[in-house]
Amino acid sequence: MDIVAETQIEEESLIPDATSTPLETEVVADTTLRKTALHLAGVDNLSEEQVKGFISAYAPESQCTIEWINDNECNVVYADDDVSRNALFHLIMESPTEFSEELEYQTKPHPTVPTCQFKIRYARYGDKKVKSAHLYSRYYLFHGDPREEKAQKSKSKSRNQDERGSPLDERLGPKVSDLTLMERIFQVRRKPRKSRRDRRSRVSKR
């Protein structure tokens, strides 16, 4: 093999293959059971109030908080394992003969939204909201993002406060820099002048 042919082979070996795909690093979700929380699927188009209404209809004695994952899934979090397990058995459609903590079960119907069909199981630590999930939410698209509404209200309140001014500003009056030239002259003229008698009394006291 001559030098030219050998050099050509080496150059071809350095050219990357366009058809090959780079190695992708897959993030493996943590499947460890989180026994203080229940994973509820099928909550599309339901508000947090409606989800809690479903929970309280069958497990009213158990206080819970809602952790949203996406439009279709959420976690129902309880104080401890026993409360969570008790709520799970109250929410399942039919008590299974052989219960498995790993399986997902059909729930009882929503009391006011019977068309909803839920699936419930123990939550896992990998059941978390992805970053910027609100940007892909269909629920926020139709009903609005409460965080944006809160920010708008805060801006509006701040703007109104700036227009009205603070109570201290009302007591002190406008700043001198905010007054026009004529207003400054008028304000100086309004200041009371001391009489000659007052001046004489001060001199006599000295």
Swiss-Prot record:
<feature type="region of interest" description="Disordered">
    <location>
        <begin position="147"/>
        <end position="206"/>
    </location>
</feature>
<dbReference type="GO" id="GO:0005634">
    <property type="term" value="C:nucleus"/>
</dbReference>
<dbReference type="GO" id="GO:0005846">
    <property type="term" value="C:nuclear cap binding complex"/>
</dbReference>
<feature type="compositionally biased region" description="Basic residues">
    <location>
        <begin position="187"/>
        <end position="206"/>
    </location>
</feature>
<dbReference type="GO" id="GO:0071039">
    <property type="term" value="P:nuclear polyadenylation-dependent CUT catabolic process"/>
</dbReference>
<feature type="compositionally biased region" description="Basic and acidic residues">
    <location>
        <begin position="159"/>
        <end position="173"/>
    </location>
</feature>
<dbReference type="GO" id="GO:0005829">
    <property type="term" value="C:cytosol"/>
</dbReference>
<protein>
    <recommendedName>
        <fullName>Uncharacterized protein C16C4.16c</fullName>
    </recommendedName>
</protein>
<dbReference type="GO" id="GO:0000184">
    <property type="term" value="P:nuclear-transcribed mRNA catabolic process, nonsense-mediated decay"/>
</dbReference>
<dbReference type="InterPro" id="IPR019416">
    <property type="entry name" value="NCBP3"/>
</dbReference>
<dbReference type="GO" id="GO:0000340">
    <property type="term" value="F:RNA 7-methylguanosine cap binding"/>
</dbReference>
<dbReference type="GO" id="GO:0003729">
    <property type="term" value="F:mRNA binding"/>
</dbReference>
<dbReference type="Pfam" id="PF10309">
    <property type="entry name" value="NCBP3"/>
</dbReference>
